[in-house]
Amino acid sequence: MGSGYQLLQLPRERFRKTSFLVWVIILFQRAISMPLGIVTNSTLKATEIDQLVCRDKLSSTSQLKSVGLNLEGNGIATDVPSATKRWGFRSGVPPKVVSYEAGEWAENCYNLEIKKSDGSECLPLPPDGVRGFPRCRYVHKVQGTGPCPGDLAFHKNGAFFLYDRLASTVIYRGTTFAEGVIAFLILSEPKKHFWKATPAHEPVNTTDDSTSYYMTLTLSYEMSNFGGEESNTLFKVDNHTYVQLDRPHTPQFLVQLNETLRRNNRLSNSTGRLTWTVDPKIEPDVGEWAFWETKKNFSQQLHGENLHFQILSTHTNNSSDQSPAGTVQGKISYHPPTNNSELVPTDSPPVVSVLTAGRTEEMSTQGLTNGETITGFTANPMTTTIAPSPTMTSEVDNNVPSEQPNNTASIEDSPPSASNETIDHSEMNSIQGSNNSAQSPQTKATPAPTASPMTLDPQETANISKPGTSPGSAAGPSQPGLTINTISKVADSLSPTRKQKRSVRQNTANKCNPDLHYWTAVDEGAAAGLAWIPYFGPAAEGIYIEGVMHNQNGLICGLRQLANETTQALQLFLRATTELRTYSLLNRKAIDFLLQRWGGTCRILGPSCCIEPHDWTKNITDEINQIKHDFIDNPLPDHGDDLNLWTGWRQWIPAGIGIIGVIIAIIALLCICKILC
């Protein structure tokens, strides 16, 4: 026993060395794991509580989902002259790029190619990986020149230029972008399924993506003195026809104006340049509800046949190469008539109507003298390949949404034919006379553009060509980007009954503004019922908590408008709370960064680290969704239809059938009991 005990004992010297080595290892391990700085026992918790205490709460800012929000939500002006004033050049400031995961569908995007007077480029090429914004309703493509007083173009309000999941502080050459800020959305950790793979790439070119249900329309411009105090912007109809832009306007107005000029053969039919100016009396806020662009319903419609096209001046100058030289200036105006007798002219130019706030006004037009030819010098305008839209003469029913989102539309620039060298109003008058006497009018139109594949928004109305339309319009459907008809037939404008019905239909459909859409490379449905939190940029203040609103088809217009107004009011009510929560999250993000070297916030603060600012956004958002479900998703039945089984006296039929069934069951039960007993 004693010998065994002695065998288990270590020599005293070896025991000391072993104990010293063990203590050195323990102290070294504690020294390595000990955070830098003074940490007391009262502030350091030994247990790991990150996943225990904060399991159902936000324990780290890694749960924030980055989202790009467009500045259009603030109601800013989106026309090119107004937008370019928000951008300026600076030197010595390095660009910054921030990535984000999802974004809104933008109503207006921009694409710039600006050169200096010496021919050098003003804007840098995009870095590798920077692609254009993938969801744009209208792309404003601007080409021109300017002084460009600086190295890079920044946003004067501190906002970002949103590209495809990358937001930059500078504008890149030839790359489509939208103005916006980066926000964060609080999301729980997503559940990963091994059988459901995450999409590797979101399609950039929406025209090639048949599932995008969205159509991109490109508007071309020429601009001089870009970046200077006073710039000049021209809307490009074709290579030789332009429209002077001197006041804010909607993209729908430009689309309709383009179609008006093409339909009425008001393009430059020579190598000279023809520039039209728009009369100040013509309201440029025509078109549909442009998402949230101006927060109002548009009811005015631009008809081409009632506009007054007047040539103001023609300057000629013979050059050595014997080419015609000159600058042609034209003015587009109108003068409403005082009585309805002018609606049916016999020898006068065509007549159309203008719908203004539900009121129909008629007017006559005048044009060039018979056989007058527009000639000018050879110009070298900026070249673009896409014009705003083709000629359209089809009529649209706005109350019936499209059931086929994968239709195609035509949109490409096409030069005027050589046969249109002159503008002869005698031919137009004869055409007008035939329109007055027949129900299938034929109007003179420019050649139909070539087709390029486009996808349609299911919210938009499909325009169907009807018999008797012009050959140019019959070549393909009209553009789905407009809820109201842009160019109506002359015979339609001469019929008061048809005009009145169309006016009522337009005023009704215009109240139905499209819902908001969001594109993302992951799951769009994951953001339902959660709050958008403005984060980056001073322009973030005022961005509403829009949430995710899905498309609705077959809606009752009045109830839909009521639901939209109610949701907007509730969203405004949430702004103050959201901003306070934003500041709290910003402070917490800074704390997480500073305490990362000490093991994280939860390791030092314990259960106090859990972020739980009371958020009632989900409760109110649920109420918003309930309103949308009650008033929008479930259309009310038509009580005027007596053939409906659930209206009138027939609504008692199901109840009667149920009562009869109960009586039969009771009788059968009594019979069975009598037989068995």
From Swiss-Prot:
Residues 315-349, 370-483, 489-508 are annotated as: Disordered. Residues 525-540 are annotated as: Fusion peptide. The keyword GTP-binding does not apply. Disulfide bonds join 54-610, 109-136, 122-148, 512-557, 602-609. A lipid is attached at residues 671, 673 (S-palmitoyl cysteine). Keywords: Clathrin-mediated endocytosis of virus by host, Cleavage on pair of basic residues, Coiled coil, Disulfide bond, Fusion of virus membrane with host endosomal membrane, Fusion of virus membrane with host membrane, Glycoprotein, Host cell membrane, Host membrane, Host-virus interaction, Inhibition of host innate immune response by virus, Inhibition of host tetherin by virus, Lipoprotein, Membrane, Palmitate, Secreted, Signal, Transmembrane, Transmembrane helix, Viral attachment to host cell, Viral attachment to host entry receptor, Viral envelope protein, Viral immunoevasion, Viral penetration into host cytoplasm, Virion, Virus endocytosis by host, Virus entry into host cell. Glycans are attached at residues 41, 205, 239, 258, 269, 297, 317-318, 339, 406, 420, 435, 463, 564, 619. The chain crosses the membrane at residues 652-672. Gene3D superfamilies: 1.10.287.210. Residues 306-486 are annotated as: Mucin-like region. Residues 34-651 are extracellular. The signal peptide region modulates GP's high mannose glycosylation, thereby determining the efficiency of the interactions with DC-SIGN(R). N-glycosylated. The record marks 502-503, 638-639 as: Cleavage. CDD domains: Ebola-like_HR1-HR2 (cd09850). The keyword Transmembrane helix applies. Residues 315-326, 370-421, 428-445, 458-472 have a biased composition (Polar residues). Residues 673-677 are cytoplasmic. One of its GO terms (biological process) is entry receptor-mediated virion attachment to host cell. One of its GO terms (cellular component) is host cell plasma membrane. The mucin-like region seems to be involved in the cytotoxic function. This region is also involved in binding to human CLEC10A. The coiled coil regions play a role in oligomerization and fusion activity. This is Envelope glycoprotein. The gene is GP.
